[in-house]
UniProtKB/Swiss-Prot annotation:
EC numbers, comma separated: 6.5.1.2
Gene it is expressed from: ligA
Biological process annotations from GO: DNA repair; DNA replication
Domain BRCT: 594-672
Protein name: DNA ligase
Native organism: Cronobacter sakazakii (strain ATCC BAA-894)
Length: 672
C-alpha cells in the first residue's frame, strides 16, 4: 500500500510536471480543473501531515507573513546593463566594432532574442532548489524578493533533470502579459484601486509588494535569458545551447530566438519582430543581439558597465511627453460622447500622434487633466494612443479645466449620464448627424445588411448632402442621385443601387444586428431571432420575456425593451419592412418537443470557423430544428460544434465534459 510520503512525492512530481508543460513547453496535457484538483489533494494531505511539508512543494509558493521592508542582496556577479542602439546605422557600427576586435570572424554567430519590457531578476538555485530571488537594483546591490517570486508559477521552485550545478544563478525578466494587465486595471477601476500606466509598471509594482499574497493574485510570468553565478557544474559554451539547457531544467525560455550569421539576418529578425509585436500578447521594446560563442564573448570583454558582445536594438519609443492643446468631444453611433485630447504632434512608436482618447469624464478626473498640461502619451501596436498620466511637475500656470458639454456638440440636444454608467450620451437619436452617420455605417456593414460597395465616405457624403436621414432612405436612392457624389460614375452608381436591392433579402438576425440596439451583437441578435421567430413577437416582448433568451440578462433585456418602446424606432422599422420591403424567410414555429431532430431542445454553442456555411446560416438551421443557440459555454450547454481554429470555448467545453462535434458531423445531422 502506498505510504503518505510516497503519495506526497508522487503528487508533487505530477504537479511540477504539469507546471513544466504549461509554463515552459506551452503544451498543457490536462485542463486547469485537473491541476487544481491535484493541488487541493496535495494541500489537504500536507495540512493533515505538516511535518512532511517541504520548501519546494508547489503549495509553498505563498504563505509567509508580510514584510516590513525588503532586505538588500549583493550580487556576487554584477548584473550589467546593455548598450542601446536605435537605428540600423548604429547596429552596423556595433557589428563592425565586434568584427574589428576579434582575431577571426569565421565563428561569429549572433543570437537574437526579444527585449522584454518587464523587470530583470536574479534567481539563485542551490542543488536545484530556489533559495533566493533579487531585483537588479543598481547592478551591484538589489532587493530580496524571494517570497514574491515564489508565487510566480512559471518559475520552478525545484529544477528538473540531471547535471544541475551546485550553485546556479539564472537571470531573466518577470513581466505581465497584456491580458493580465487589462484584467488588473479593470478590477482596479471597479474597486477604486490603483490603475497602472503600463504592464511594466504593473509588474514592478507587483514584485515589490511587501505582502506576497498580493503578488500571488497578479498573473506574472517569466522568461530566462542568461546566467550569472556558476559553481560546481558546467554549462555549454554557446549562449543558445545554455538557453536550451535551462529549458530542459524547467525554466521558461522565449521561443522567439534565432541564430544568425550576418548583419542582414539580424535586421530581418528585428523587422519581423517589430511587425509581429502587436500580436505577441506581452510588451517588448526591442531585440537583444548577443555573440553566441562564450569564447568570443571572453575575447570581446566588457566596457564600463556593459558587455562589448551584446547590444539592445530598441524599437521607436511607445511613450512620449507632449502638451494637450485642447479637448474636443466626438459623438458615436449610440450617442456616446467621447473626449479626445488634441495634442502637440509627437512621434510615438514611429507614428506622428496628434490626438489621444480620454474615454470619459471619470478618466479625465482620474488623470486630473487640464488643458495645457504636459502629458505622457502611449501607443502600442494598433491601439489608439492614450494619455497615460499628467506630468504635474511640468504643469504651467495658464492651464484651464476640461468642461464636459451640457449639449451635444453636433446637434445641440441635451446630454445625459445614466446612474451607474461611465458614458455621457446625446439624447438626439437620429436627428443627430453624428449618430446618423455612424448608425448608417453600421447598418450597411458586412455583418449587418451587407451592402456591397457602400463605404464610409459615401455615407458621409449622403448625410452631409442631406440625401439620407434614416436607413430606409438608403433604399430610395437612385443612380442619378448617386452619380452626383465624389468619384461616383454612372456604372458605380448603378452597381450600388443593385447592391441595395439585393440587400433587401436578409435574415431576421442580420436585420436585428443592423438596427444597432445597444449591447446587441451578432450572437445576441441570432439568439433573439431564434427565440421569438417574428419581429412582432420580439417588439411585444416584456423584459421578463427577453430574459428567457440564452445569454440575455437584465441589462441587455432593458436596452432591447427600451429600443422597441421608442416610437421613432418603430417608425424606422415600419418604413424598412413595409415601405422599402426588407424581408427574410418566415420561420417554421414548432415546439421543440414536437421536432424529430437530434438538436431539438438542446442548448448549442458554435465556435471556430465553419467552411461549408456561414455562422448565421448555421444558427438559423439549428434554431429551426429546435435548438437554443447560445454564445457562451456553461454547465447548461448540451452540445458544442467546433469549427476550425476553435479556442477557449472548446477548452471549456472539454473541461465541463460537454459533448463536442465537428462541422462534418453537424452537417450529417442536419442532413446536408
Amino acid at each position: 500500500m502506498e505510504s503518505i510520503e510516497e503519495k506526497l512525492t508522487q503528487l508533487r512530481t505530477t504537479l511540477r510536471h504539469h507546471e513544466f508543460l504549461y509554463h515552459v513547453m506551452d503544451a498543457p496535457e490536462v485542463p486547469d480543473a485537473e491541476y487544481d484538483r491535484l493541488m487541493r489533494e496535495l494541500r489537504a494531505l500536507e495540512e493533515a501531515h505538516p511535518e512532511l511539508v517541504t520548501p519546494d512543494s508547489p503549495t509553498q509558493r505563498v504563505g509567509a507573513a508580510p514584510l516590513t521592508e525588503f532586505s538588500q542582496v549583493r550580487h556576487e556577479v554584477p548584473m550589467l546593463s546593455l548598450d542601446n542602439v536605435f537605428d540600423e546605422a548604429s547596429f552596423l557600427a556595433f557589428n563592425k566594432r565586434v568584427q574589428d576586435r576579434l582575431k577571426s570572424t569565421d565563428a561569429l554567430v549572433y543570437c537574437c532574442e526579444l527585449k522584454l519590457d518587464g523587470l530583470a531578476v536574479s534567481l539563485l538555485y542551490e542543488n536545484g532548489l530556489l533559495v533566493r530571488a533579487a531585483t537588479r537594483g543598481d547592478g551591484t546591490t538589489g532587493e530580496d524578493i524571494t517570497l514574491n517570486v515564489r508565487t510566480i508559477r512559471a518559475i520552478p521552485l525545484k529544477l528538473r533533470g540531471d547535471n544541475i550545478p551546485a550553485r546556479l544563478e539564472v537571470r531573466g525578466e518577470v513581466f505581465l502579459p497584456q491580458a493580465g494587465f487589462e484584467k488588473i486595471n479593470e478590477e482596479a477601476r471597479r474597486t477604486g484601486g490603483k490603475v497602472f500606466a503600463n504592464p511594466r509598471n504593473a509588474a514592478a509594482g507587483s514584485l515589490r509588494q511587501l505582502d506576497p499574497r498580493v503578488t500571488a493574485k497578479r498573473p506574472l510570468t517569466f522568461f530566462c535569458y542568461g546566467v550569472g553565478l556558476l559553481e560546481g557544474g558546467e554549462l555549454p559554451r554557446s549562449h543558445m545551447e545554455r538557453l536550451q539547457q535551462f529549458k530542459a531544467w524547467g525554466l521558461p525560455v522565449s521561443d522567439r530566438i534565432r541564430l544568425v550569421k550576418t548583419p542582414e539576418e539580424v535586421l530581418a529578425f528585428y523587422h519581423q519582430v517589430e511587425a509581429d509585436r502587436p500580436t505577441l500578447g506581452f510588451d517588448i521594446d526591442g531585440v537583444v543581439i548577443k555573440v553566441d560563442s562564450l569564447e568570443l564573448q571572453e575575447q570581446l570583454g566588457f566596457v564600463a558597465r556593459a558587455p562589448r558582445w551584446a547590444v539592445a536594438f530598441k524599437f521607436p519609443a511607445q511613450e512620449q511627453m507632449t502638451t494637450v492643446r485642447d479637448v474636443e468631444f466626438q459623438v458615436g453611433r449610440t450617442g456616446a460622447i467621447t473626449p479626445v485630447a488634441r495634442l502637440e504632434p509627437v512621434q510615438v512608436a514611429g507614428v506622428l500622434v496628434s490626438n489621444a482618447t480620454l474615454h470619459n469624464a471619470d478618466e479625465i478626473a482620474r488623470l486630473g487633466l487640464r488643458i495645457g498640461d504636459k502629458v505622457v502619451i502611449r501607443r502600442a501596436g494598433d491601439v489608439i494612443p492614450q494619455v497615460v498620466n499628467v506630468v504635474l511637475s511640468e504643469r504651467p500656470e495658464e492651464t484651464r479645466p476640461v468642461v464636459f458639454p451640457a449639449q451635444c456638440p453636433v446637434c445641440g440636444s441635451d446630454v445625459e449620464r445614466v446612474e451607474g454608467e461611465a458614458v455621457t450620451r446625446c439624447t438626439g437619436g437620429l436627428i443627430c448627424g453624428a449618430q446618423r452617420k455612424e448608425a448608417l455605417k453600421h447598418f450597411v456593414s458586412r455583418r449587418a445588411m451587407d451592402v456591397d460597395g457602400m463605404g464610409d465616405k459615401i455615407i458621409d457624403q449622403l448625410v452631409e448632402k442631406e440625401y439620407v436621414h434614416t436607413p430606409a432612405d438608403l433604399f430610395r436612392l437612385t443612380a442619378g442621385k448617386l452619380t452626383g457624389l465624389d468619384r461616383m460614375g454612372p456604372k458605380s452608381a448603378q452597381n450600388l443601387v443593385n447592391a441595395l436591392e439585393k440587400a433587401k433579402e436578409t435574415t431576421f438576425a442580420r436585420f436585428l444586428y443592423a438596427l444597432g440596439i445597444r449591447e446587441v451583437g451578432e450572437a445576441t441578435a441570432a439568439g433573439l431571432a431564434a427565440h421569438f421567430g417574428t419581429l412582432e413577437a420580439l417588439i411585444n416582448a416584456s423584459i421578463d420575456d427577453l430574459q428567457k433568451v440564452p445569454d440575455v440578462g437584465i441589462v441587455v433585456a432593458t436596452h432591447v425593451f427600451n429600443f422597441f418602446e421608442e416610437e421613432s424606432n418603430r417608425a424606422v422599422i415600419r418604413d424598412l419592412t413595409e415601405e422599402v420591403g426588407i424581408h427574410w424567410p418566415a420561420p417554421q414555429v414548432v415546439k421543440a418537443e414536437e421536432i424529430d431532430s437530434p438538436f431539438a431542445g438542446k442548448t448549442v454553442v458554435l465556435t471556430g470557423t465553419l467552411s461549408q456555411m456561414s455562422r448565421d446560416d448555421a444558427k438559423a438551421r439549428l434554431a429551426a430544428l429546435g435548438a437554443k443557440v447560445s454564445g457562451s459555454v456553461s454547465k447548461k450547454t448540451d452540445l458544442l460544434i467546433a469549427g476550425e481554429a476553435a479556442g477557449s470555448k472548446l477548452a471549456k467545453a472539454q473541461e465541463l465534459g460537454i459533448e463536442v462535434i465537428d462541422e462534418a458531423e453537424m452537417l450529417r445531422l442536419l442532413g446536408e
